[in-house]
Design a protein with these regions (language model features):
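N-terminal secretory signal peptides that target proteins for export/translocation
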Residues: 1-16
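Bacterial N-terminal signal peptides
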Residues: 23-35
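Terminal peptide-recognition signature
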Residues: 55, 100, 151, 171, ...
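Extended, small/polar residue-biased N-terminal targeting/export presequences
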Residues: 68-157, 213-239, 430-431
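PDZ domains, with a preference for the canonical peptide-binding region formed by the helix
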Residues: 86-92, 172, 176-214, 268, ...
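PDZ/PDZ-like domain segments forming the peptide/carboxylate-binding groove
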Residues: 133, 140-191
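Conserved PDZ fold ligand-binding element
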Residues: 171-193, 282-283, 346-349, 354-356, ...
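Cleft-lining beta-strand/loop regions that shape enzyme active-site pockets
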Residues: 200-372
Length: 433
C-alpha cells in the first residue's frame, strides 16, 4: 500500500512539474514578446505616426484651397490618426492616408510608396525640380529606377487587367495585350513592383486569361530596369506608325507623358522626319501623365511657312511646320492635367475632331513632396482655369465618343480605329474637319 501511495505521489509531482514548466515557458515567451517584438511594433507604430503627421501638416500648409474644399481638415487628423498609428507597414499607412486625402475630393492629391510604379514615375517627372537631393538617400546606389514590364493595370471586380501597354516595352514585345487578366507571376499573385524586383533581364512566367471563358495561358516576359526619366520618351518614339488605308498614309504618335518640353521637341522632330510624308495624323494623348503647356498646340495652329529643299539631282523635300494637314486628337479618361488643356484648345481653335472618351477632369497644378521615410506625397498646390473655365471635375468630352471596355478587350482598340477613320474623313472633306 505504501509503495502504491509513493508511486501515485511521484506521478502527481511529475504532472505538477510539467504544468509549472509550461507556465514558466509561457511566461518567458511573453517576456520575450514584450521585450523584443513589442518594442519593434511600437517603433513601427511610432514611425508610421510621424509620417502621417508630416503628411497631414504638408497638406495643411500647402493645399491650394485654404478652405480645403469644404472639408474640416483638423477633424480629418482626429479621424485617421488612430488608424495610421496602427499601420504596420508603409503600404498599410498608404491605405489610411489615401482614404484621408480622398476626403478632399480633388485631383493631383495622392500618397505613394515604393511599392507602386507611379512612385518612380512621379519622382522621374520631378527629379530635376527639387526632389533629387531629398530622394537619393532612399534609392539603391542613389539611382532612380525600378524593374518592370511597362504595363498599366486596373482592378475591376476584384480582378487585375492590363489597361495600357507602353510601346516597345517588355510587355509589348512579349505579346501581352490590353484587356488581359493577370492571374499570377511565377505562380504568385501579381504585384506591380514586387513581382519583378528581383528579375531584371530574367524571364518570368505570367499567367493570363484573354477571354472570360478561355483557358489560362502562360506568357514569358523579361522585365527590365526602367528609367522613369526616359521611359516615356522611348515609348513615344516606339509608338510612331505610318498606317496605309484607302490609298492614304495616316501618321500616328502616342504621347505617354507631356511633363517636359523634350516630348514636344520629339513630336516636332517626328512631324518633320518620319511623319513628314503622311496625309494626316492621329495625335494620341491617352493615359500616362499630363504636364503639357498651351504652346504645344502651336504646330497645329500657328501660320505655316512652306519650305522646299531641292537637291543637286533635282529631288525635292518639303518641311511644313506648323502642320497644315488633317489631325485628330485621341483622348480617354486617362488623359489628364495639361493634356486636357490641349484638348480644350484643340476644340477652341477648331484644329480637328477629338475622338475617344471624356478626359479625366483632373486639372490642378500638382507638386511632389518627399516624406521622412522616402515616400512621396503628390499634392494639388494651385487651382487652374482655362479662359475662365475650371475643368477640374468636368473634363473635355470628345466630338466622337467611342466607348471602350478594358476587361478581355483582346488588344482591340476601337478608339484608335475610329480616329484613323476620322482622319480619312477629314482628308476626303477638308472643309468639314
Amino acid at each position: 500500500m505504501l509503495t502504491n501511495f509513493t508511486r501515485s505521489l511521484a506521478a502527481r509531482s511529475r504532472r505538477l512539474s510539467r504544468q509549472w514548466l509550461t507556465v514558466l515557458l509561457a511566461s518567458v515567451l511573453a517576456l520575450l514578446f514584450y521585450g523584443v517584438v513589442a518594442p519593434v511594433l511600437s517603433r513601427a507604430e511610432s514611425s508610421q505616426a510621424k509620417v502621417f503627421e508630416q503628411i497631414w501638416q504638408t497638406v495643411n500648409d500647402n493645399f491650394y484651397d485654404p478652405k480645403f474644399n469644404g472639408v474640416d481638415w483638423q477633424a480629418m487628423r482626429q479621424k485617421y490618426a488612430p488608424q495610421a498609428t496602427q499601420a504596420r507597414s508603409p503600404e498599410a499607412l498608404a491605405v489610411v492616408v489615401n482614404q484621408m486625402l480622398e476626403e478632399l475630393n480633388v485631383s493631383h492629391t495622392r500618397y505613394y510608396t515604393s511599392a507602386e510604379p507611379e512612385y518612380y514615375q512621379l519622382a522621374g517627372i520631378f527629379w530635376q525640380r527639387g526632389i533629387q537631393r531629398q530622394l537619393k538617400p532612399f534609392l539603391p546606389n542613389g539611382k532612380l529606377e525600378y524593374v518592370g514590364i511597362g504595363a498599366y493595370t486596373r482592378d475591376v471586380g476584384g480582378k487585375t487587367f492590363i489597361r495600357a501597354v507602353l510601346d516597345g516595352s517588355p510587355a509589348a514585345r512579349a505579346g501581352l495585350k490590353v484587356g488581359d487578366q493577370l492571374l499570377s507571376v511565377d505562380g504568385k499573385p501579381f504585384q506591380p513592383i514586387q513581382s519583378f524586383a528581383e528579375n531584371a533581364d530574367r524571364p518570368v512566367k505570367i499567367q493570363i486569361q484573354r477571354t472570360p471563358d478561355a483557358a489560362a495561358q502562360t506568357i514569358a516576359v523579361t522585365p527590365k530596369r526602367l528609367d522613369p526619366t526616359t521611359m516615356f520618351l522611348e515609348a513615344m518614339k516606339s509608338s510612331v506608325e505610318v498606317i496605309e488605308r484607302g490609298g492614304k498614309k495616316i501618321g500616328y504618335i502616342h504621347i505617354w507623358s507631356y511633363a517636359d518640353d523634350l516630348y514636344q521637341r520629339q513630336l516636332e522632330q517626328e512631324l518633320s522626319d518620319r511623319l513628314s510624308q503622311v496625309d494626316g495624323l492621329v495625335w494620341d494623348l491617352r493615359d500616362g501623365w499630363g504636364g503639357a503647356e498651351p504652346s504645344y498646340l502651336n504646330p497645329f495652329t500657328a501660320p505655316a511657312l512652306n519650305i522646299t529643299f531641292t537637291n543637286r539631282n533635282g529631288t525635292k523635300g518639303r518641311f511644313d511646320l506648323p502642320w497644315k494637314k488633317p489631325v485628330v486628337m485621341l483622348v480617354n479618361q486617362g488623359s489628364r492635367s495639361g493634356k486636357e488643356i490641349l484638348a480644350y484648345g484643340f476644340r477652341q481653335f477648331r484644329v480637328g475632331k477629338i475622338v475617344g472618351s471624356k478626359t479625366a477632369g483632373a486639372l490642378l497644378a500638382g507638386r511632389a513632396y518627399i516624406m521622412r521615410d522616402g515616400s512621396l506625397l503628390y499634392l494639388a498646390v494651385a487651382d487652374v482655369s482655362v479662359n475662365g473655365e475650371r475643368l477640374e471635375g468636368k473634363g473635355v468630352a470628345p466630338d466622337i465618343d467611342v466607348p471602350f471596355t478594358v476587361p478581355y478587350a483582346q488588344g482591340s482598340d476601337p478608339q484608335k480605329d475610329r480616329a484613323i477613320a476620322a482622319v480619312l474623313e477629314a482628308i476626303a472633306k477638308p472643309d468639314q474637319s
